[in-house]
Amino acid sequence: MLDNQNDLQFLFKKALYFLKFRPRTKKEVFDYLLKKIRNTSYSTDDIKKVIEKLKEMDLLNDKKFIEDYVSFYSKNNPKSKKVLTLELLKKGVNKNLIDEYFLRNQLDEEELAFLLLKKRFQRWALIDKKKRLKKAFDFLGRRGFSFETVKKVIEKLEESGKIELDI
């Protein structure tokens, strides 16, 4: 294990480069640095030291990562809470942090699904009603929305006069 701060500069610079493009989780940075130290004299303890230094500098913060991730996907490519949770878990975010975030910040899945479907129904205007309905269920289902949520959203769209379906 390398104790000298200068010896850790290599890893620190690699981590900064990796963080330059977008926010990352601790696990993503750890895995990235682990690949970089293969066939070198660095150890996982050195990686942990670098990660601690990044956390102290507030360059690595899983809570902030969750906020940024959910905010980005709520605006740009809405997904259900279930899908967002699974994606965050894949990125190595602690389940307790995710649950804590969603307890503090409610995600209005119906509203997200409504906005998504409203846009899509304009594209599907020339398709017959039955196919549009199937497309709506498939489209929102792939984004993790429940059957009940999809059904409510379609009824809401129908009531608002945006679409006409014979359910």
Residue ranges and their predicted role:
Residues 1-167:
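An alpha-helical, amphipathic repeat domain used for nucleic-acid recognition
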